[in-house]
Amino acid sequence: MKLAMGIYDAPEKQAQPVFYLEPLKNNVAVFGGPMSGKTTFIKTLLVRLHQREQIPNESIYIIDFSGNMGEYSKLPNVCACFDNSNEENVKRVFKAVEAQLAKNVRLLKGQSFVGCEFKNQKTDIRHIIFIIENFNSFLADERYDSYQEVLMKLCRDGLSKGLTVVFTANDCSGISRWLPNFRQKIAFDMPKEGYMEIFGSKVGDLMKLPGRGYLNVNESVYEFQAFLPFVKEEHASLSKIMKQFKGKTNANRLVAFDEELSIQNYGAYSASSKSYEDDSLVLGDDSVIIGLDYYEHQPVAINFDESRSLAIYGKRQFGKTNVLRLIRNEIKKKHGKEYRFLISG
């Protein structure tokens, strides 16, 4: 997989070759000050991943500490895009990434992911891209301290199993120990001492342009100009990509529970995107769906043919009666005059 992301100056060749990013082979670190082009680079990456003629099994997870992803978070292969306002959502992203990685390991059976890349398009092996926008904020937030060692392991061991980690950062504060796991480094406009820490060599003065920076091609450092996501008007071009995938659903997409879950809005949060009634038909008359799994959005159901009794515990005003009422209504709807005893109190 090679993605055209910009051009770089190669004076020894007297040329300006196209820079192709190879996310299957490298984790990617993107640095730069405010308005330097970091987020635009990530948007271009997302677009390039969706512009290939054959889209492989791909799952993209984004923790967006900058809050700038906007409409790009709705691209079809984006499975999650959460900000840092709710720790539970960040936990869900990590859990989803780890679960898919474990599935890859099981299916690869000791092979390297790159060595068997998409030979069978029907396989459940997926390429996972895990993006953290504003890595400095992630590292500085005490709520996420426990995730740092998990992330370090993902950075160190993930590539051979189909996981690529990408982050953006304003500077190198607290990031030095992470850099050995990121072979591809890109640095837009920032203080000169930052380039030395990132690349280990001095660089010249940059032209002050958004998207202008430095990157490494193998071990050499070159001046670089990043491409924009689209040549023409951004919104129209993004809409065109969305239309190409119209009718296709992403069964792995995670959404935030930003309202109370009900039978009416069930389909908006279910992994299957099916209505409550449709999922109930699949499970049969003896089962009652009482909600969705918080992490995978799969139906949580009680089979009353197998479970002859049920105890519901919880604090006052935390939903016990609502669950009981739902069960009663569904039993009445499915079984009519058949009696089941429900005791509340």
Annotate each predicted stretch with a short phrase.
Residues M1-G6, I175-I289, V300:
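Phosphate-binding and hydrolysis-coupling loops of NTP-dependent motor/remodeling domains
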